[in-house]
C-alpha cells in the first residue's frame, strides 16, 4: 500500500487520486478494513474475488454489502492496465504492451516452457541505469510502478491463460527497469503474489534480477522470503563491465562479489549470473577464463544469453559456434553454465523494443 511515508521516500512513485487495490498486501487490506470500521474477515472475501475469481470490477463482489463496495470504489481502482499491442511468436511467446493510467507504456512477456508458463514483469517506466546494450534505457526513467501495477501484469496474463485453463507458474522480474531501484514496491509485489490468499506462486518459482545495486543486495539478503536471485554481470573485468554497464563505476565488480558472498552466507542459496554475449566485446575464451576465476567457489550458475539486436545500439550477436565454445570453456573450468533458449525472436523480443516503437505515447 502506498503511504505518505512511501511517497516521501520514493519520489518516482505516481500520485494518483486512487491507488490500485492490487497494491495492498493481505495484512494491509485487513488493517485498512478495520480502520474503516469493517470486519477483518472481509479481506479474505475481497482477495478471493480479486485473485481467484479474477473479477474486473468491485461491483461484481456480490457477497459484500453495497456500502463496502462503495467504500472500496471510493478509495481504490481495479483497472490499471490497458492492452495496446499484443504480439505472439510462433514459439508461443506473447509480448504485451500495456498503457498505464497516466498514458505511459510498459512491457510484459509470457514465455511458454515444458515446465510451465513464465511471466516477465516490468518494475519501472523506463530505466536510468544506462546499460549500453539495452533498449529500456532509451528515454530514461519516467517513474516507478506501484506494486499493484506490477501485480496487474501477472493477473492480466493469467486472465488470458484462463481461457485454456493454464496457469502462471513462474515469475521473473527481468522486464523494463531496475527492480532494486523500486525496492519497496517490488518487495510488496513479491509478498502479494506469494501469499496463499492471492496467486500463491511459490517463492522458489520467482526470480528477481539486478544490475548490481549493492546496498539493496545486502537488504535483500536480510529479507525473510526465499526468492531466486540473479545478477546481470556480463563481464568479469571492470573496464569491460563499465563499458557495458555504467552502474559498474559506482558499484564495481569486487564490491559486487563481496555483496553476493554476504547474500550466500545469509541465505545459503545459489545465485545466477546472467552473461550476455556481445560479439568482439566479452565473448572470447579469455573472457570465459576471467569469469571462471572471478566466481570460482561461489554457489552459482551462469546463464549465457545470445543478445538480441537493438537497432539503436551497435552491439552484434556472437556467432553460435563461439557461444558453444564459451560454454564449453566454463564447464571445463568447473563452472555450471547453460545457454538460454531464445524465445520470441520473430517479434520485438528484446527488453524495451516494443515500448521504444510506441514511445511517442510518452513524449506528448
From Swiss-Prot:
S-adenosyl-L-methionine binds at residues 177-178, 209, 232-234, 308. The keyword Iron applies. InterPro entries: Aldolase_TIM (IPR013785), Methyltransferase_A (IPR040072), RlmN_N (IPR048641), RNA_MTrfase_RlmN (IPR027492), rRNA_lsu_MTrfase_RlmN/Cfr (IPR004383), rSAM (IPR007197). CDD domains: Radical_SAM. Coiled coil: none annotated. It is an enzyme of class 2 (transferase). Pfam families: Radical_SAM, RlmN_N. [4Fe-4S] cluster binds at residues 127, 131, 134. Residues 113-346 form the Radical SAM core domain. Its EC number is 2.1.1.192. GO terms for cellular component: cytoplasm. One of its GO terms (molecular function) is rRNA binding. Keywords: 4Fe-4S, Antibiotic resistance, Cytoplasm, Disulfide bond, Iron, Iron-sulfur, Metal-binding, Methyltransferase, rRNA processing, S-adenosyl-L-methionine, Transferase, tRNA processing. It is found in: Cytoplasm. Reaction proceeds by a ping-pong mechanism involving intermediate methylation of a conserved cysteine residue. Specifically methylates position 2 of adenine 2503 in 23S rRNA and position 2 of adenine 37 in tRNAs. Confers resistance to some classes of antibiotics. HAMAP family: RNA_methyltr_RlmN (MF_01849). This is Probable dual-specificity RNA methyltransferase RlmN. It comes from Staphylococcus aureus (strain NCTC 8325 / PS 47).
